[in-house]
């Protein structure tokens, strides 16, 4: 059975320069991991802009996100960890 992992990226593209840098790196790394681990893991990812996306705003409140960019990681449907800042792409493979 494949391990189920979901990466949720939270950023603000309008004013956060770090978010604009990390967002494409997050997406590229998520796609790379999907391909690399396609036989052993079911990896999904989504990006939310916390300025105008209601679901993103809900997640910020629920998981008490205090800084952006942030990534929420869910393993087997359970919240596993919150990662912030430029470390996001580097830490993703550790969850697979």
Q: Across the structure, where does each feature detected by a protein language model lie?
A:
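Short acidic active-site motifs
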Residues: 55-59
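Feature detects long, helix-prone N-terminal segments enriched in hydrophobes
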Residues: 46-48, 94
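Local sequence-structure signature of Cys/Sec-based thiol-disulfide redox active-site neighborhoods
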Residues: 1-36
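Hydrophobic beta-strand anchors of alpha/beta hydrolase catalytic cores
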Residues: 7-8, 45, 71
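A generic structural motif
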Residues: 38-45
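Short loop/turn motifs at secondary-structure junctions and domain boundaries
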Residues: 62-64
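Non-catalytic, surface beta->alpha helical segment in thiol-disulfide oxidoreductase systems
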Residues: 66-96
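Conserved acidic residues
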Residues: 49-54
């Amino acid at each position: 059975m494949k391990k189920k992992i979901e990466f949720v990226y939270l950023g603000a593209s309008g004013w956060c320069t770090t978010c604009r840098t990390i967002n494409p790196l997050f997406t590229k790394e998520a796609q790379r991991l999907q391909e690399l681990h396609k036989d052993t893991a079911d990896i999904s990812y989504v990006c939310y802009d916390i300025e105008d996306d209601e679901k993103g705003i809900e997640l910020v409140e629920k998981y008490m996100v205090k800084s952006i960019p942030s990534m929420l990681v869910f393993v087997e449907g359970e919240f596993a960890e919150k990662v912030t800042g430029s470390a996001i792409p580097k830490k993703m493979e550790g969850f697979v």
